[in-house]
């Protein structure tokens, strides 16, 4: 197996952060340290504060109160380039990639290491090709991104994050527009990348069963408050899920011994 640099020391810590807009609190005071080198799923109902929290981690909006630390340093103390070398963010609504091939899209990930006028060298080309191979798109590297299937397109964007060589990936609903086969494809890829490279991954996920299967840790929000956190085995209990989603839910053991499977009564 090829050896990769392991980045399992990188993580975020939240100190009593909150987020408010006029007349409404979207995220109530929250303190939390995300497990380093693991996949953490942010789960909860629509409007629970998952994407708000992820955007704060990605510096797209500052907290109204409290402090966010990245590797024990205040988030605002990082320069834009240094932050991009540590953290890569994939929004739910992907920006257009019209006229770009997979290889050209993935190459954008090298921008934080050079800037707009920096030279693209042999080491960069190696990083790009490595990322394309890691996500299984080498045969499609010359194809236009717009011509790919939904799952292939999502893998191309993830390859761009890999080429960015960041230590933490922030993914906002990376499977929301995919069928179940492509959901499995993308989430298994994300989990494998985390294991092989020690990447810290924080992902907003709606499907609790997918989250339990592919995440190492779960953080549950309801109404802007964190109401549960723990391993999938700790979260996948009927009373806990009912508290998170507000409806009666049951649990069945997985026939193959994986994470338990939830269902609605």
From Swiss-Prot:
Organism: Escherichia coli (strain K12)
Highest taxon above the source species: Bacteria
This protein's UniProt keywords: ATP-binding, Cell inner membrane, Cell membrane, Ion transport, Iron, Iron transport, Membrane, Nucleotide-binding, Translocase, Transport
The protein, known as: Iron(3+)-hydroxamate import ATP-binding protein FhuC
Chain ranges of the ABC transporter domain: 12-248
Keyword Cell membrane listed: yes
Alphabetized InterPro entries for the sequence: AAA+_ATPase, ABC_transporter-like_ATP-bd, ABC_transporter-like_CS, P-loop_NTPase, Siderophore_ABC-ATPase
UniProt topology in membrane: Peripheral membrane protein
């Amino acid at each position: 197996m090829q050896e990769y640099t392991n980045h399992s020391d990188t993580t975020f810590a939240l100190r009593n952060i909150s987020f408010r807009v006029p007349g409404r609190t979207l995220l109530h005071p929250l303190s939390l340290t995300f497990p380093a080198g693991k996949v953490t799923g942010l789960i909860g109902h629509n409007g629970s504060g998952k994407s708000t929290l992820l955007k704060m981690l990605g510096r797209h909006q500052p907290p109204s109160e409290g402090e966010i630390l990245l590797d024990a340093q205040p988030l605002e103390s990082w320069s834009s380039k240094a932050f991009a070398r540590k953290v890569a963010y994939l929004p739910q609504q992907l920006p257009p990639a019209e006229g770009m091939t997979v290889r050209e899209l993935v190459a954008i990930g090298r921008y934080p290491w050079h800037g707009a006028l920096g030279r693209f060298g042999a080491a960069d080309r190696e990083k790009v090709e490595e990322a394309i191979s890691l996500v299984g798109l080498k045969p499609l590297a010359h194809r236009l991104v717009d011509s790919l299937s939904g799952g292939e397109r999502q893998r191309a964007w993830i390859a761009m994050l890999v080429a960015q060589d960041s230590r933490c990936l922030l993914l906002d609903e990376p499977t929301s527009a995919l069928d179940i086969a492509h959901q499995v494809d993308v989430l298994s890829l994300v989990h494998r990348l985390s294991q092989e490279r020690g990447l810290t991954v924080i992902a907003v996920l709606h499907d609790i069963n997918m989250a339990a299967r592919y995440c190492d840790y779960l953080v549950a929000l309801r109404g802007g408050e964190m109401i549960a956190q723990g391993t999938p085995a700790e979260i996948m209990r009927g009373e806990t899920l009912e508290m998170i989603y507000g409806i009666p839910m049951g649990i069945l053991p997985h026939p193959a011994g994986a994470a338990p499977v939830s269902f609605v009564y």
